[in-house]
Amino acid sequence: MAKPKSIHYIDNEKFLKEMVIYKRGLDEAKSKDELPPMISEYLGECFMKIAQRLSFRPNFINYAFKDDMISDGIENCIQYIKNFNPEKSSNPFAYFTQIIYYAFIRRIQKEKKQLYIKYKTMQSAPSLLENVEVSANDGDKGYNQETMNTDQKANMYNFIKNFEDAKAAKSVAKKPTK
């Protein structure tokens, strides 16, 4: 009878062994004042698998910038690989999953900030259009037509309000009380 296939997509024991080997090479390179060793193919594959699988969680699945989130997660894993301590933790899967999770959160926050800037610019655009004169040569070519319907405008204004409210609440929380 065939051995049942493992449901885990990463072998944590092998991942830990590879991390110990990498950490040993990193310590040797540091003592010899050399460049750090290259990350093994297996470690890179693990980072990629963790990031891809985490991107399928319900709280991350529907973002248009999912590839950017995955790239940020892998980049952060490579950046912080030297901080993993096998003497403290024997679970590199959890360590790197957490790094990728917070990279995803940071990317979402960056994208929301960019969307906020875009919406604020669009919100101020009507006031800019009021100061523009349409010449008689333009005729009825539709230059001043609305490009957003009322639902889209409502969503934009709600997003702006929620973003500004969250920002205000965050700044109030940071202020020390007397």
What are these regions (language model features)?
Residues 118-130:
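Single-stranded nucleic-acid nicking/binding segments centered on His-rich, glycine/basic loops
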Residues 5, 12, 74, 85-87, ...:
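Alpha-helical interaction segments
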Residues 45, 49, 53, 68-75, ...:
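Structural recognition of an alpha-helix C-terminal capping motif at a helix-to-coil junction
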Residues 1-68, 127-178:
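Extreme N-terminal regulatory/targeting segments of RNA polymerase sigma factors
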Residues 57-65, 77-99, 110-115:
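Short alpha-helix-to-loop micro-motif enriched in aromatics/charged/Gly
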Residues 53, 102-117, 134:
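Arg/Lys-rich amphipathic alpha helix in sigma70-family domain 2
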Residues 29, 51, 74-75, 82, ...:
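A generic structural signal for ordered alpha-helices
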